[in-house]
């Protein structure tokens, strides 16, 4: 089984430095789990690690797609799994570092991103049937094939009724049976996972976020966005909707002032950190590291290494 070390946490908490120190001590390579750092040319706004900051540690899944290209959790999972195997086969430790919770979950839970359990034509047929004969009629179709769903769901909850009928058509099983089977498979992964979440005092974190935004502006975020625009990248692209990029675009378009743009970037980043922490708290497999309780990053690194070895 492959050992997999994960260092996650909210934006600006200091994941980069900790993960590099761990990679140095554990002979590891880092796989980025960041939904913005995958894009080329978007360096400042994504707080992308520089060559110097890498300190010679190989990094994967950074600068892998153009800003106009589609990239989703399924794309990440495929590339990350390939990198994990490659790193492990070369006798090194794969270290996942990042704050995109869904990306991380795609690796530590056995999510199926295929459409094997979907039938769009059947869904369309049932939706049309509900329009023609009524939602009650479609709901009644569950009675003989999935009594539990029939009794639990209301006719007005058409989306879930359709899903239950779809699952039965494809699998021959009730949706509750199907869900239980999938839950058993959820933990069937080829990794021995050590999952750590870095956290710190909320006010201190927010100060770090605000300071980071000021640093980004000083490094030339506005010029970076101008360059992206000149290359043909537009506001409707997923990449350009990222925090920092959309606000600067509003400013360049004359919709808001520069001060308003900076304020909105800081606010958006703080809110994002809050959402990240809420997401990570849901995962019972993770170990939380409160950075405020340690005197140095070296102490944190040593603590993580000890917990991994004692497991």
Curated annotation (Swiss-Prot):
InterPro entries: Dimethylallyltransferase, IPT, P-loop_NTPase. Residues 34-37 are annotated as: Interaction with substrate tRNA. It comes from the Bacteria. Its cofactor is Mg(2+). It catalyses: adenosine(37) in tRNA + dimethylallyl diphosphate = N(6)-dimethylallyladenosine(37) in tRNA + diphosphate. The keyword Lyase does not apply. Belongs to the IPP transferase family. Catalyzes the transfer of a dimethylallyl group onto the adenine at position 37 in tRNAs that read codons beginning with uridine, leading to the formation of N6-(dimethylallyl)adenosine (i(6)A). This is tRNA dimethylallyltransferase. It comes from Clostridium botulinum (strain Hall / ATCC 3502 / NCTC 13319 / Type A). The lineage of its organism: Bacteria, Bacillati, Bacillota, Clostridia, Eubacteriales. The gene is miaA.
């Amino acid at each position: 089984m492959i050992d997999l070390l994960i260092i996650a946490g909210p934006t600006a908490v200091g994941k980069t430095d900790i993960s590099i120190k761990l990679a140095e001590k554990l002979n590891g390579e880092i796989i980025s789990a960041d939904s913005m750092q995958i894009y080329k040319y978007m360096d400042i706004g994504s707080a992308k690690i520089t060559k110097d900051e890498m300190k010679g540690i190989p990094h994967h899944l950074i600068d892998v797609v153009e800003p106009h290209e589609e990239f989703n959790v399924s794309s990440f999972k495929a590339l990350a799994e390939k990198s994990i195997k490659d790193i492990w086969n070369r006798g090194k430790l794969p270290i996942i570092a990042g704050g995109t919770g869904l990306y991380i979950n795609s690796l530590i839970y056995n999510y199926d991103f295929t459409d094997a359990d979907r039938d769009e034509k059947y869904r369309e047929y049932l939706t049309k049937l509900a329009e023609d004969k009524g939602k009650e009629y479609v709901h009644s179709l569950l009675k003989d094939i999935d009594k539990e769903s029939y009794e639990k769901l209301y006719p007005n909850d058409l989306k879930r009724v359709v899903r239950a009928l779809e699952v039965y058509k494809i699998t021959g099983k009730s949706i509750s049976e199907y869900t239980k089977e999938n839950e058993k498979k959820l933990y069937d992964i080829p990794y021995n996972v050590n999952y750590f979440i870095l956290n710190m005092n909320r006010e201190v974190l927010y100060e770090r976020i605000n300071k980071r935004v000021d640093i980004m502006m000083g490094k030339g975020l506005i010029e970076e966005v101008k360059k992206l625009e000149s290359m043909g990248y537009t506001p409707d692209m997923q990449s350009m909707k990222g925090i920092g990029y959309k606000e600067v675009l509003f400013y360049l378009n004359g919709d808001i002032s520069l001060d308003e743009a900076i304020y909105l970037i800081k606010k958006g980043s703080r809110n994002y950190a809050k959402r990240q922490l809420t997401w990570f708290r849901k995962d019972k497999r993770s170990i939380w590291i409160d950075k405020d309780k340690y005197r140095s990053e070296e102490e944190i690194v040593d603590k993580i290494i000890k917990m991994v070895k004692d497991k």
